């Protein structure tokens, strides 16, 4: 997993204008003005190097990198252990991350180091197919939020409060890690089309 993690983390940081360098298999260095000031471990821990210890700019960079490092580690790890989603007419190898309340959360690594894609679907009647895909390019948190709403783990009306967002992530993370339903199931609702980063209506996709 270390190789995939560092590759994706480097890509994400590069998109934000942050340069990285792979020091060795256990350490990804983060550069500021061409000089290493931080490094990230294979378990997403971020350490400040002596060159950045007295720099306010390096300190700000530390906090930005730490947030990205944690998010990338979370989705790379969960995809590594997830089973394939076996559905016919599905051209890409998506991995099944969660299946609850008639909704599916899946993800895949895109080809040619183009990052990760996440999608939520709705099972058709009798679970004979999936449709109405909401696609998210690299935005795992938004995909989890959409899944939580579509599956009924949390209501759409709760999406704008920080406390309610924390509950959304708690409920979804519980399902991803433990499998069974949390003790308290929240009311069902459906999101409108504007919530998806990329939204398109799929033809129905049927299980293999």
Q: Where are the language model's segments positioned?
A:
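Short Lys/Arg-enriched alpha/beta "domain-start" segment
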Residues: 1-18
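Short secondary-structure junctions
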Residues: 13-26, 84-86, 94
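Short, structured interface segments
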Residues: 65-79, 139-155
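Short N-terminal "domain-start" leader segments
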Residues: 75-117
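Short aromatic-glycine-(Arg/Gly/Cys) micro-motifs in beta-strand/loop hairpins
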Residues: 107-134, 168
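A short, exposed loop/beta-hairpin motif centered on an aromatic-Gly-Thr core
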Residues: 127-141, 155-157
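Charged/polar low-complexity intrinsically disordered segments, enriched in acidic residues
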Residues: 156-203
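Non-Sec secretion/translocation targeting segments of pathogen effectors
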Residues: 205-208
């Amino acid at each position: 997993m270390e190789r995939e993690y560092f590759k994706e983390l480097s890509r994400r940081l590069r998109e934000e204008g942050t340069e990285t360098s792979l020091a060795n298999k256990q350490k990804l260095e983060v550069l500021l003005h061409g000089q290493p000031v931080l490094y990230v471990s294979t378990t997403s821990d971020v350490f400040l190097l002596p060159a950045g210890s007295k720099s306010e700019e390096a300190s700000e960079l530390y906090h930005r990198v730490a947030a990205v490092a944690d998010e990338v580690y979370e989705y790379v790890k969960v995809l590594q252990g997830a089973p394939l989603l076996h559905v016919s007419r599905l051209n890409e190898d998506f991995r099944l991350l969660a299946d609850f309340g008639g909704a599916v959360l899946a993800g895949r690594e895109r080809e040619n180091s183009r990052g990760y894609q996440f999608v939520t679907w709705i099972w058709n009647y009798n679970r004979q197919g999936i449709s109405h895909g909401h696609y998210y390019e690299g935005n795992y948190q938004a995909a989890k939020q959409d899944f939580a709403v579509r599956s009924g783990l949390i209501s759409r009306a709760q999406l704008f409060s920080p406390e309610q967002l924390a509950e959304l992530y708690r409920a979804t993370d519980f399902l991803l890690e433990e499998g069974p339903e949390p003790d308290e199931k929240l009311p069902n609702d459906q999101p409108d089309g504007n919530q998806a980063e990329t939204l398109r209506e799929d033809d129905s996709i049927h299980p293999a």
